[in-house]
Amino acid sequence: MKISVNWLKDFLPSFSPDITSLVEKLTFLGLEVEDVESTPLPDLRVVVGRVQSVALHPDADRLRICMVDTGLEEPLQIVCGAPNVAEGMLVPVATEGSRLTMQDGTSFVIKPSKIRGQRSFGMICAADELGLSADHSGVMELDSSYAVGEPFARYLDSDTVLDIAVTPNRPDVLSHLGIARELGSAPDAILFPEEAPLEFSADSPLVQVMDSGACPLYVGVIIRGVTVGPSPRWLSARLESIGLRPKNNIVDITNFILHALGQPLHAFDLQKLKGGRVIVRSDFSGSFTTLGAEQCTVEPGMPVICDTQMPVALAGVMGGLDSAVGEGTVDILLEAACFAPSAVRRSARKAGISSDSSYRFERGIDIRNVLPAARAAVALILETAGGTVGEATLQGDPSPALLVLPFRPRRANELLGTAIETDAMQAMLARIGFRTLALDEGVMQVEVPSCRIDVLQEIDLIEEVARLHGYDNIEASGRLAATYPASRTRPGYFPDFLRGVAVGLDFREVLTNPLIRREEAAPFGDGLVSVLNPISEGLEVLRPGLVPGMLKVIAHNIRHGNRDMRLFEVAHGFSVADPSGAAEQGPLGAYCEKEWLVLALTGNRYPRSWNQPPDRVDFYDAVGAAEMLLGKLNLLDKSAVNIYNENTVSIDLELTEGKKKRSQRAGRAMRLDSALLSQFGIEQDVFTVELDVSVLEMLYSPDVVYDPPSKFPAVQRDLSFILPGTVPVQSLVGLVRSSDPLIRDVSVFDVFERGSGGGGERSVGLSISIADHSGTLQEGRISEILRTVGVNAESKLGAVIRQV
């Protein structure tokens, strides 16, 4: 963004800075100055001249022979090729010996010459030939305030232009007024342009806003009887100083207000508006021609300004060619509006158009600045183009309530490591427009100016204090002191604890985007949460879970040659709480947000080696990983793995509520379907474990009770059971383990299927470890325990001990 130092003086009359100090001050305020350009004054031998006559060149159709009065006894003959040179014009004339420095930095000296056989004793100059701007469309036309024969430089002020890099969160400084606010000692010291008194009507048919979400405020002013023509020199000079080419007085004023006050404006030729009115709508589908003479396709969701028949502007982005102000314009409709940043961003992206207006609307403008900017523009139009104000209408609230934030000076000093007095902080904030409404028990109530849409909470105010105090004035501390509790609270700690456990199990963490394509999310649920304003067409829904993102990571790695992976992620999934809308809404309204831990395994179980063949991971690796993780959380004894189908098992945890116990679903382990994997371009098996973090945290207990091993020898007994095919082996293992307190461990050493499809009987071999802390086990006690095991298995599960 280019800022003219001379233009800044319009807002700060006493402003006379040293440029080096100014650049340093802006930098410390967080506004990086990328470039500094000084505009030198033209050579004193460049004088004001009057074109007395213009004749065609006898040997060149595009050249003219001009006789120019420069205050000397005889007029100078000058050959000129500018298309706009005309008799009676006041122009800058470079006389013999003048050294001209162009806009690009090159220079040359004017000498008498012959051009196509005709003598020329000087040059009538365009703006770029004097280094004033990049405009080379024609010679400069001066107004009547210039005196013939006077050095042109006497009418100019040397200027310095700063090119400032503005971060996206600071739209308030995208104007000369915004920079003046940063530099000013107080808001009252800033001079605002003169405003025209206007009476607005809220119920006029002139403007109809059909989408108030996209356009919360629209101001329209009709000015009749204007004369469209060249802008006065002061106005052209302001625009040229920042690299803009003047067009006509109406358009130049809209550009002037944009760069002066930061409020985009647009002027319509009222006679070209069908029905003499405008409608703001977002449901139009069609096309229109922009000011740049390009066809723009409009889709529903893109706000447009329409007359009664067709679009005349893409709201906040660019106007239309068919309603543009030109030389024949007599009546205009001046638009000053506030358009929603998301709506303008979407329109500009889809249309492929970027403009000074869209740049500001996309970042957010000051809604309270719309009316003052409109009044200032009307005053300038009446001054430079004449005319009278007709109807003025306003749709929306031009002065919404300001945000008030609590601010603790003590907290600011703690975070910044400073000892700034409360009065000093109050004065700093007041300097940039933050008013202190009250101060009670060390807490200030601070009113945020409407232009500072980036200040939303106390920490933002603390940042402002640091910025205004000066980061270089904050002394380095001799010691480090934490300003947060020594131990993190459990809700913030548990996900990190899970990450540590997963890393300890040889899984690697991935971080995936919560926004994904609708096609990627569709296989994982119906209640998808759509984003109203997606940042791109490929990121239009929130992920229902973590598996879609995990599969994208796996596919990416496989494409790059890495086929063996053990990955995990802890993050949130999102869904509509009840897609049918019948259920009562929860704390998040119609939406559900849940935190998940997902493990994913694919490829070989072990790294490739000379001493063992490749061994692929399988379903039991996933279940085993889940059990190991539950073991680290002291939840393995409370867990049960239940078969859901041949590719999926549920993982349930035992929950105690008073004297009752119930099963709580914690997650699942599964082998992903090959058809699903093919959608992501994966041709090898992938196994996943999904665990609900809230359930794990609810049941997790960090307290571990030490159970010492028995001093007496343990006894191992192997039993073989005939188990119905419908009963999970896990149920048998759990039942045997709970049959007697002396049973220390139960493990499966053999499974033999007698039937197919999971419906037949199975032979399951269990190894049972029995130990007593009080003494050596006797055979009678061992036999009693095994009989109890057999009775429980047969009565509760239908499992029979197989006799050998």
Curated annotation (Swiss-Prot):
Q: What is its main location?
A: cytoplasm
Q: Which cofactor does it need?
A: Mg(2+)
EC number(s) of the enzyme?
Answer: 6.1.1.20
Gene Ontology annotations of biological process type: phenylalanyl-tRNA aminoacylation
The coiled-coil segments of this chain are none
Residue limits of the FDX-ACB domain? 710-802
Which keywords does this Swiss-Prot/TrEMBL entry list?
Aminoacyl-tRNA synthetase, ATP-binding, Cytoplasm, Ligase, Magnesium, Metal-binding, Nucleotide-binding, Protein biosynthesis, RNA-binding, tRNA-binding
Which family does the record claim for this protein? Answer: Belongs to the phenylalanyl-tRNA synthetase beta subunit family. Type 1 subfamily.
**What binding partners and quaternary form does the record give?**
Tetramer of two alpha and two beta subunits.
Tell me the protein's name.
Phenylalanine--tRNA ligase beta subunit
| Origin species | Chlorobium luteolum (strain DSM 273 / BCRC 81028 / 2530) (Pelodictyon luteolum)
